[in-house]
Amino acid sequence: MSFPYFISPEQAMRERSELARKGIARGKSVVALAFAGGVLFVAENPSRSLQKISELYDRVGFAAAGKFNEFDNLRRGGIQFADTRGYAYDRRDVTGRQLANVYAQTLGTIFTEQAKPYEVELCVAEVAHYGETKAPELYRITYDGSIADEPHFVVMGGTTEPITTALKNTYTENADLPDALDIAVEALRAGSAENSSNDQPVLGVASLEAAILDANKPRRAFRRLTRSTLETLLQERDSKESAESEEPIESEEGKKTGKKSDADSSD
């Protein structure tokens, strides 16, 4: 007599979690962080058409890591939900927390009821309405529907440990856009170096996708950063660093010159 194959619920959940985590880890990394002007998204993404970062509504942005077809389906569903609610009630009634809760419920249902969980991790970010001073909100939603409110930054996809470590060491609150971009790019490079061999090139602007939620814009806060803009911002940061490094040298030379002149005058 043959017995039907049985698997305990705990083992089934463990196997689903392992499947989802491995799928997310195979993807490229994404960083979202708060800065002085709003929220910055930076993703390792060489594709120009398959985008990981998107606008959900006026003041709400979206970023994801994992399987593109799965998180793109969630992205489109979030946009439809936001548009419907904003039309039926008021545009201010659409919030980042509300959309994050919808995504958490959807992913939780998929994880427990469907045969295969979604191999995705999401970030929903919101900036305050124009004229308000509320801090940006960042929400992380994982494959099983878990949701967390992150105060400063979110790291998803790929090898997250070196990127998170780099951000903990370099992140500063209320940084300007060039500084925030440099922090995010250097953190992504730390994760890329962890996975690549020595002969592979350093992660460049051509392999990056970036956008911001600009809290200083009156209505639609989302704005993509082109690759030329990225290059300009990073060069601005480099020139700022070089100027700061030259200042102490000049002051020391000035001190030496001043001492010399005093000695000459005494003679």
Curated annotation (Swiss-Prot):
InterPro entries: Ntn_hydrolases_N (IPR029055), Proteasome_alpha (IPR050115), Proteasome_alpha-type (IPR023332), Proteasome_asu_bac (IPR022296), Proteasome_sua/b (IPR001353). Transmembrane segments: none annotated. It is found in: Cytoplasm. One of its GO terms (molecular function) is threonine-type endopeptidase activity. GO terms for biological process: modification-dependent protein catabolic process; proteasomal protein catabolic process. The formation of the proteasomal ATPase ARC-20S proteasome complex, likely via the docking of the C-termini of ARC into the intersubunit pockets in the alpha-rings, may trigger opening of the gate for substrate entry. Interconversion between the open-gate and close-gate conformations leads to a dynamic regulation of the 20S proteasome proteolysis activity. The keyword Ribosomal protein does not apply. GO terms for cellular component: cytoplasm; proteasome core complex, alpha-subunit complex. Residues 231-267 are annotated as: Disordered. Pathway: Protein degradation; proteasomal Pup-dependent pathway. Keywords: Cytoplasm, Proteasome. It comes from the Bacteria. Residues 234-243, 252-267 have a biased composition (Basic and acidic residues). Pfam families: Proteasome. Belongs to the peptidase T1A family. The 20S proteasome core is composed of 14 alpha and 14 beta subunits that assemble into four stacked heptameric rings, resulting in a barrel-shaped structure. The two inner rings, each composed of seven catalytic beta subunits, are sandwiched by two outer rings, each composed of seven alpha subunits. The catalytic chamber with the active sites is on the inside of the barrel. Has a gated structure, the ends of the cylinder being occluded by the N-termini of the alpha-subunits. Is capped by the proteasome-associated ATPase, ARC. HAMAP family: Proteasome_A_B. PANTHER family: PROTEASOME SUBUNIT ALPHA/BETA. NCBIfam families: 20S_bact_alpha (TIGR03691). Component of the proteasome core, a large protease complex with broad specificity involved in protein degradation. This is Proteasome subunit alpha. It comes from Mycobacterium ulcerans (strain Agy99). The lineage of its organism: Bacteria, Bacillati, Actinomycetota, Actinomycetes, Mycobacteriales.
